Amino acid sequence: MATVRISSTSMTKAVLRSQTTNKLITNKSYNLSVGSTKRVSRSFGLKCSANSGGATMSAVYKVKLLGPDGQEDEFEVQDDQYILDAAEEAGVDLPYSCRAGACSTCAGQIVSGNVDQSDGSFLEDSHLEKGYVLTCVAYPQSDCVIHTHKETELF
């Protein structure tokens, strides 16, 4: 997961060592603002948000869903967000039931890209080898293209 957590103390003060005496120099401090953290994180394709005195950065990937009738929906998904949740936020209507990876209602098949679906328990190794994915427990690990509505193909 591409998340970086920085405590407020490490963001606001850095202590330098003197090269000649190897003693701590505590009278100098350097500030790193959340604003500059956001700017730098965007250059690496990360989103940054402030939270309780720190900053959190997540990678963001493009996910394209290909529906059974040829419709295409593309939206951004953070690497710590399930694809189904992001689809709903983007206004995409997908089938689901358990939201826990314990059934096959939300099944899709990966055309390209990688996901982490270690939270799921329903799919067998043979399904995973064929690229099947449960969108309710799948975190993107790259840009992805996924065919949706694949539950009937699992049986």
UniProtKB/Swiss-Prot annotation:
Q: Which InterPro entries match?
A: 2Fe-2S_ferredoxin-like_sf (IPR036010), 2Fe-2S_ferredoxin-type (IPR001041), 2Fe2S_fd_BS (IPR006058), Beta-grasp_dom_sf (IPR012675), Fd_pln (IPR010241)
Where does this protein reside within or beyond the cell?
A: Plastid, Chloroplast
The free-text tissue note of the record is: Expressed in roots and leaves.
Q: Name one GO molecular function term.
A: 2 iron, 2 sulfur cluster binding
Residues reported in the UniProt entry to bind [2Fe-2S] cluster: 98, 103, 106, 136
The record's GO CC annotations read: chloroplast; plastid
Question: Which ranges carry the 2Fe-2S ferredoxin-type domain?
Answer: 61-152
User: At which residues is N-acetylalanine found?
Assistant: 50
State how the cofactor is bound: Binds 1 [2Fe-2S] cluster.
What keywords sit in the KW lines?
Answer: 2Fe-2S, Acetylation, Chloroplast, Electron transport, Iron, Iron-sulfur, Metal-binding, Plastid, Transit peptide, Transport
Q: Which cysteines are joined by disulfide bonds?
A: none
Q: What is its main location?
A: plastid
Q: Which cofactor does it need?
A: [2Fe-2S] cluster
Role summary: Ferredoxins are iron-sulfur proteins that transfer electrons in a wide variety of metabolic reactions.
Family of the protein in this entry: Belongs to the 2Fe2S plant-type ferredoxin family.
* PANTHER family registered for this protein in UniProt: FERREDOXIN (PTHR43112), FERREDOXIN-3, CHLOROPLASTIC (PTHR43112:SF30)
Q: What is this protein called?
A: Ferredoxin-3, chloroplastic
Protein's organism: Arabidopsis thaliana
